[in-house]
Amino acid sequence: MSDISKYAGIFPAFYACYDKDGRISPEAVRALARYLLDKGVKGLYVGGSSGECIYHSVAERRLVLENVMAEVGGRLTVIAHVACNSTADSRELAAHAQALGVDAIAAIPPIYFKLPPRGIAKYWNDISDAAPDTDFIIYNIPQLAGVALTIPLLKEMQKNPRVVGVKNSSMPVQDIQMWRDEGVIVFNGTD
């Protein structure tokens, strides 16, 4: 397991940045990353809900992350959300994120079809395997993903040595304490 101290502090969700024509703006991405760095945040969570990840193509998601890393890579801890409806696309984004040097990747469970816990674990582990030198963070957002992280599923995922934490967007304080008691880092936020 990596040095988890790099995950202490404030990690804002990175918002989507567009130009006047509605396309990803590399300049605006870099400006926002620089602004957040200058404000003293410890890290960034890139490509999550606030980043409108589900609506972006793989190419757009790569472009955002490339520009974030070009601006703040090595100076901030960067977590890249890489989940897509396609496991292959998720794996591509995971490998790309690792190649760029992110600190961790994260993923929501598969959406639309509700998979059993073993199917969710396989999906997450397949993604994690595409970035074998990168930490993995489970993104728990049941109000949008349609499935909540359970302790048995968390324990199954903890068999993967790359799993270091949970990004919790489900809000109940009991969840935060429950997962912390299981020895994982918990990021909490509604994004």
Where would I find each of the regions flagged by the language model?
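Active-site beta->alpha loop and helix N-cap motifs at the rims of alpha/beta catalytic domains
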Residues: 2-146
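Catalytic alpha/beta core domains of metabolic enzymes, predominantly
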Residues: 128-132, 141-191
